[in-house]
Regions:
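N-terminal loops that bind phosphate or other acidic moieties
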Residues: 1-14, 18-251
Length: 251
């Protein structure tokens, strides 16, 4: 559909997914077919990864060669291994502890067949391996998500007119400082412009601020309460916190 309307470049944001299939489902949507050692066609799901013996591109449309795909992600995790997609993010997607190692091994086996070079590429593990799939099956290129968005917004020019930059995060933790959006914005902000973070909560593993050009971080939650109550009070808590910060800056 996009090609029919003349689109030549596509940005694909990858991250925060509920999938961990190495991008095999996406590849099937593009026309790729996967077969086992007996030449039986496999379902394009994560549980098939370790059984793939042959990949067919006969039904893949040729127009894919004429489209530039940029894969936007702000994680640097490789596809497999201790820092890979499955070991780091598999638990939060519902994988049982005893399955992590076998799923990781099956994903590695699949890409040893499909594209061995992807196993060493930073960011390939984003989206449960979706980034690896887009590189391998759609000739995509992994780029910094936050930097690409800031470039599209002409951030570097606009920020020069700012007196203060405020970034946000649902829960700021050590992982947030590894290159997620708030830090990406802070790094692109001139040193003379202060950057403050307003967050839902702050994790115990956060190092002291200033850090990564963020001068201070403020949680909006003011009391211990049930999640439903906390969510219902989000607007009120955010406004109160922002007002208090404004009053402090006005001293």
């Amino acid at each position: 559909h996009l090609v029919e309307h003349g689109v030549k470049k596509i940005f694909v944001g990858v991250g925060g997914s509920a999938t961990n299939d190495g991008g095999i489902g996406m590849a099937a949507g593009l026309g790729y077919e996967f077969f086992d050692e007996n030449n039986h066609r496999l379902r394009p799901v994560g549980s098939s990864l370790g059984r793939v013996a042959r990949i067919s591109a006969e039904r893949v449309p040729t127009f894919l060669n004429n489209i530039g795909i940029e894969i936007l992600t702000d994680v640097s995790n490789p596809l497999c291994g201790q820092q890979g997609a499955t070991q780091i993010f598999g638990r939060q997607k519902g994988l049982s502890e005893w399955l992590l190692s076998s799923v990781d091994q099956e994903m590695r086996k699949f890409y040893e067949l499909a594209n061995p070079q992807i196993l060493t590429q930073a960011g390939a593990g984003a989206g449960g391996g979706m980034a690896a799939g887009l590189v391998t099956f759609a000739k995509g290129k992994v780029v910094s998500g936050i930097d690409t968005c800031l470039d599209l917004l002409d951030f570097d020019r606009r920020v020069k007119e700012a007196d203060l930059v405020v970034v946000g995060e649902g829960r700021m933790d050590k992982q947030s400082l590894a290159g997620k959006a708030p830090v990406g914005i802070a790094r692109r902000t001139p040193k003379e412009i202060p950057v403050l973070a307003i967050c839902g909560s702050l994790a115990d593993d956060l190092p002291p601020f200033p850090r990564e050009n963020i001068q201070a971080a403020f949680p909006i939650i003011s009391q211990v309460a049930d999640l439903d109550v906390t969510l219902a009070q989000a607007r009120e808590n955010l406004v109160r916190t922002a007002r208090n910060i404004g009053n402090l800056l006005d001293i």
